[in-house]
Amino acid sequence: MNLRRAVLVAIAVSFAAVDLVHKSFAAADYHHARTPVAALVMGGVIVALVVLVPRISSNAAAVGAGIACGGALGNLVSLLAWSGGVPDPLLIGRTTGVAFNLADLFAVSGDMLLLSAVAVHGVRHRHELGQRV
């Protein structure tokens, strides 16, 4: 469990660093607003994933949670560090498009991997689901 937690944290810090370096060099015309509620939610999600996911005996779940935490951590640091809010340098569409950043991509892809890994783990260990803890 401790090794999975260490892997999760290492992946999260690596992905957050990639996101922050990208945000510092990319020009961004769009920004998320700075809200304390968003910072609290992101911090809570990061803590919950770091505490709970390593209890699952799945390395893929730890990797997925690490990627998702990296995205959340990247947005959290951006939210706290940049006065204009979270920069969104990536844009799809010109006037009515979607603006996002690498942290958003990391959070979504990490969540997809985490949910897939938990589903596969649940199917593989379905015989244990009825047992008392």
Predicted feature descriptions by range:
Residues 1-133:
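Alpha-helical transmembrane bundles and membrane-interface segments of multipass inner-membrane proteins
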